[in-house]
Amino acid sequence: MTQQIGVIGLAVMGKNLAWNIESHGYSVSVFNRSSEKTDLMVEESKGKNIHPTYSLEEFVNSLEKPRKILLMVQAGKATDATIDSLLPLLDDGDILIDGGNTNYQDTIRRNKALAQSAINFIGMGVSGGEIGALTGPSLMPGGQEEAYNKVADILDAIAAKAKDGASCVTYIGPNGAGHYVKMVHNGIEYADMQLIAESYAMMKELLGMSHEDIAQTFKDWNAGELESYLIEITGDIFMKLDENKEALVEKILDTAGQKGTGKWTSINALELGIPLTIITESVFARFISSIKEERVNASKELNGPKASFDGDKKDFLEKIRKALYMSKICSYAQGFAQMRKASEDNEWNLKLGDLAMIWREGCIIRAQFLQKIKDAYDNNPGLQNLLLDPYFKNIVTEYQDALRDVVATGVQNGVPTPGFSSSINYYDSYRAADLPANLIQAQRDYFGAHTYERKDKEGVFHTQWIEE
């Protein structure tokens, strides 16, 4: 008897996705390069419709045609090697789905290569971590739409469900569109986390709040417009005590790790010429956190103000909340502008409002305000920037003074706020009809004869700036 779908790669994500698929009534073949993981899967899957295989030949032959194969192997060379090993065993029309943490450019390359062999290829972003993989992730599949339609029922079944019952999956676009959108999702995630961390720093360093009060603050915030998974878990984190009944989070080494997708997002923004300042500052913040020894030494050598606050703490805490929400809006405005530009350049025809909808559940950045983004693009599909939508425009107009005060107070007290600072600088730059770039153009023309345009007349000009 043949199985309906196969999964290659039985690390935690692959294993949990296989179980998720099986739980929705599908029969699943599984294969792993090391047989030990396959044996463990068998042991853990008793009573489930999971079919183990111990060679690629056995695996491929166990699947009904056209074969549907989900690859959950390490991104990069391992994925290429697995595809190369599979190709001689596959038939025209079979479908490969790469669900790994893959660079979208690799997906574009593989899509082109496999098109020559009549093998359908889907590059699919998977968000939600190991729990989401098991209970329902947010899925971002890109590739041939015809191939997507053949696996849509399975993906629809296993995806997270929003409160209105909609599945958090949609066809994203051709070739690398799915993995691209997942990359930007991860970049936005970096910014969300950094902005929350800066809010915590203000509460701790400036307001002197206890971990119990910080936990309650995040729980309160989660009941309002900031409602989101990351705000929710932040409240939980501050309630967790260690073996000495002290806040565990305060014992964790302050060096933030990363897998590189935030960096990919920033590099791509540079290539596109898109100002992605908040996400990029969040990447840099992780970099500077990683040089712990240097920072400890510098703290003994470099002077600065000692944090102190003698104002109304309740009032300032509300300003932090407003600063966080406005900065979050600015970050998403940048991320969606980046996806808009990439869609134009690659002819992906991304439906930006739909992307917000599939992020409502299952993924790390799930949040109440994503519905507002969907509404913005429904009202104006050609919207250039989220800040120009009436809802978001009203919020940032009302909240900007709070953000300015938080940033200024942080600077005056030596509390670093790279994300908040970048947000207000982006806002002010974006709303500026005139920027001092005219001087930069004059400098470029002075030393390099790069020429310039003028406001008052047509044409391209070069000036001899000093008399010989």
Curated annotation (Swiss-Prot):
Catalytic reactions on record:
6-phospho-D-gluconate + NADP(+) = D-ribulose 5-phosphate + CO2 + NADPH
Cysteines joined through disulfide linkages: none
Instruction: Supply the source organism for this entry.
Output: Staphylococcus aureus (strain Mu50 / ATCC 700699)
InterPro entries referenced in this protein's UniProt entry, alphabetically: 6-PGluconate_DH-like_C_sf (IPR008927), 6PGD_dom2 (IPR013328), 6PGDH_C (IPR006114), 6PGDH_Gnd/GntZ (IPR006113), 6PGDH_NADP-bd (IPR006115), 6PGdom_BS (IPR006184), NAD(P)-bd_dom_sf (IPR036291), Pgluconate_DH (IPR006183)
Q: What does this protein do?
A: Catalyzes the oxidative decarboxylation of 6-phosphogluconate to ribulose 5-phosphate and CO(2), with concomitant reduction of NADP to NADPH.
Protein name, per record: 6-phosphogluconate dehydrogenase, decarboxylating
Cross-referenced Pfam families: 6PGD, NAD_binding_2
EC number assigned by the record: 1.1.1.44
Q: How does it assemble?
A: Homodimer.
Keywords (alphabetical) are: Gluconate utilization, NADP, Oxidoreductase, Pentose shunt
